[in-house]
Amino acid sequence: MTNIRKTHPLTKIINNSFVDLPAPSNISAWWNFGSLLGICLIIQILTGLFLAMHYTSDTATAFSSVTHICRDVNYGWIIRYMHANGASMFFICLFLHVGRGLYYGSYMFTETWNIGIILLFAVMATAFMGYVLPWGQMSFWGATVITNLLSAIPYIGTNLVEWIWGGFSVDKATLTRFFAFHFILPFIISALAAIHLLFLHETGSNNPSGIPSDSDKIPFHPYYTIKDILGALLLILMLMLLVLFSPDLLGDPDNYIPANPLNTPPHIKPEWYFLFAYAILRSIPNKLGGVLALIFSILILAIIPLLHTSKQRSMMFRPLSQCLFWLLVADLLTLTWIGGQPVEHPFIIIGQLASILYFMILLVLMPIISIIENNMLKW
C-alpha cells in the first residue's frame, strides 16, 4: 500500500514541500531564516488576532484600549509585547535573509527574488500601519510625517494625501482604515510567501558555494526539519528574553504619551528597522528627491540581478566582493544610527556620505569589483 502522505492531494503538497523535498547537502544556518520568517509571521498573526479582540480603532479610545490590554486582560501585556518585539525579530530575520541572498547570489532566481521584494514592501507597510494603532505621540506624528511625503508627488500629491487621511489631517478615519489594512495585510503576506516558496521550489535552493547541487541532494526531513526546529527555539528564546526582560528596549518612550496634534515631539523618528531608509530620506534637502531616494533604497534590490557581472554566483570565493559586502553592512548600520539622531552637524554630512556610499556600492563598485575579480582569475 502506498503511503497516504505521498498520495492524498493535501498531504502530497506538504510532503513535496517539507518532507521529501531534495535539498542541497551543504546549506548553512544562513538558510534558516526563511523558516524563521514563517514562524515570525505565525506569531504576529496569532498575537495580533488576540490584540484585535480587545483593541478599539477610535481616536478617543485607542490609547486607552492598549492600556486596558496591558493592565486588565489576562496575559495581555505579554501578548502586546510579543507582538511589538515580534515585529523587531521579524525585521532582524528579514534583513539577514536579504543579506544572505545578496552574499550568496540567491537573487539569480529572479522570480523568487522579486516576490521577496514585494514581500519586503508589504511587511514594511504593515509594520508602519501597526505602529500608528496605539495612538501615542510617535504613532500620530510618524503617520503625519510619512503620509505627508506623498504630497511631494507633482499635481496629485495633496489630493492623494487627503484621500489617504480621509480628511484634512491624520484623524479618526485614518486610524480606522490603518487598522483595517493592518489586519488584512498579513494574510496577503501569507499568500505571497506561499508564492515565494512555489517559485523557489521550481529551481531548488541555492547553496553557499553557488555551484549547482543537483548531484548531491538530501531529503529535507529529517535533516533540515531538525535544523529549522533548533533555529526556531533560538528565535523564540531571543524573542522571550526581549519580551520578559526589556520589552521597551526598542520602543520609543514618546509613544506612552497619548497623541496630541497640538504638541510636536522634539525628535520624530520611526521604529529602529526603518531608520536606515529614514536617514536616506533626510539626507536629500529636496522633498521629492528624498521620497524618490527612500523608495529607490529598497527598489534597488530589483536591479541587483541585472548588475551581476561576476562569473561566479556566490561571494564565497570572491574576497574583494566580500570586503565591499561588509562595507555595505557597516554603511547600513551607520545609516541606522544617523536616522535616530537629530538633524544637526555632524550628523547631516555623515548621513549624506553614508547615503551616497550605499548607492555607490550597489550600483557602481560591486559590478566593477566583480569584473576585476573575473580578470584576476586569468592571471
Curated annotation (Swiss-Prot):
An annotated GO BP: mitochondrial electron transport, ubiquinol to cytochrome c
Cofactor or coenzyme needed: heme b
Keyword set includes Cytoplasm: no
The UniProt record lists the keyword Ribosomal protein: no
Location(s) in or outside the cell: Mitochondrion inner membrane
CDD domains membership: cytochrome_b_C, Cytochrome_b_N
A single Gene Ontology CC term: mitochondrial inner membrane
Entry membrane topology: Multi-pass membrane protein
UniProt similarity note: Belongs to the cytochrome b family.
Annotated protein name in UniProt: Cytochrome b
